[in-house]
Amino acid sequence: MTKEVPYYCDNDDNNIIRLFIIRHGQTEHNVKKILQGHKDTSINPTGEEQATKLGHYLRSRGIHFDKVVSSDLKRCRQTTALVLKHSKQENVPTSYTSGLRERYMGVIEGMQITEAEKYADKHGEGSFRNFGEKSDDFVARLTGCVEEEVAEASNEGVKNLALVSHGGAIRMILQWLKYENHQAHKIIVFNTSVTIVDYVKDSKQFIVRRVGNTQHLGDGEFVVSDLRLR
């Protein structure tokens, strides 16, 4: 019997667009703690298994997406394909965009985190995050993409929208929504975890419902009370 999880279900309210925000499956760079950024890495066998399990889990819950928008990087494309295949949703309209990509890390892409930290220190930078795409530009790109996709979904009558993206990108979206008083960057968004956000049309408000659910992997999630955010 599938455990009941509030809001982890189809939305049938015409005034709401339910966003299912999914992180891609595991890659070898994830395992080795290598900064990927815009590097076009593939998911590994564990990542494939994670995405397959998520697909089966969505099907067991009877969740059907009206539309899917994914980052155009390979690891997200592969995750999207497996999730849709195993949830029997291969015919759902699906598109790919650079707007949902991970943060571009510049010269430190391909370095392990410890190596990137040493590189930053050597070059007089307080953090390796100071390289590549600036935080303001990253936020503007992501939020602009989310708002555009939500507006388009609203015009199309979409009620359940899946967004497939990256760990850093999802944390930044949560931070933009003022989740956990701007401390969202401290949250670990696990591979293939599902974060659920409702967009309420009449109030133009985003409400975070679930964060980082990994029950398809036999785990739990971060506890979220209903937060009316942005």
Swiss-Prot record:
The active site is at 24 (tele-phosphohistidine intermediate), 102 (proton donor/acceptor). Pfam families: His_Phos_1. It is an enzyme of class 3 (hydrolase). Keywords: Cytoplasm, Hydrolase, Nucleus. GO terms for cellular component: cytoplasm; nucleus. It comes from the Eukaryota. Belongs to the phosphoglycerate mutase family. BPG-dependent PGAM subfamily. Metal-independent phosphatase active against a broad range of phosphorylated substrates including nucleoside tri- and diphosphates, phosphorylated organic acids, and amino acids. Shows no activity against phytic acid, phosphorylated carbohydrates, and nucleoside monophosphates. This is Broad-specificity phosphatase YOR283W.
